[in-house]
Regions:
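N-terminal secretion-targeting helices of virulence/extracellular proteins
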Residues: 1-102
């Protein structure tokens, strides 16, 4: 007789992690927009050093946004690989592993 299927604790945890990662990635994408806009306005700090600083700030901001998206993409990929339903024995093993009791 087939063992009863139950929701996967790992799948559920990955879903929660994805929500958090997407939220944080959105925060990161907006993190330096105010500073960048202020610098681009020409009313905060001007000159060659200011222009260089602004360019570096924007480059780092873009890189940070890409890295945050990489985290979201990795969690999504792992979620796709994780079945939403597993046997009770598998679910129990996952719970033990997630609790550090392997």
């Amino acid at each position: 007789m087939a063992e009863r299927m139950v929701p996967s604790p790992r799948h559920e945890r990955l879903r929660q992690l994805l929500v958090e990662a997407e939220y944080r990635a959105n925060e990161v994408r907006q993190a330096y927009q105010r500073a960048s806009s202020a610098m681009r306005s020409g009313q905060v700090w001007t000159g060659p050093t200011a222009a260089t600083w602004t360019t570096e700030l924007e480059a780092r901001h873009q890189r940070l946004g890409r890295l945050a998206q990489n985290v979201v993409d990795a969690v999504e990929e792992e979620l796709r690989r994780s079945p939403p339903l597993v046997t009770e024995a598998e679910a129990n093993a996952m719970r033990r592993e997630m609790a550090g009791r392997t």
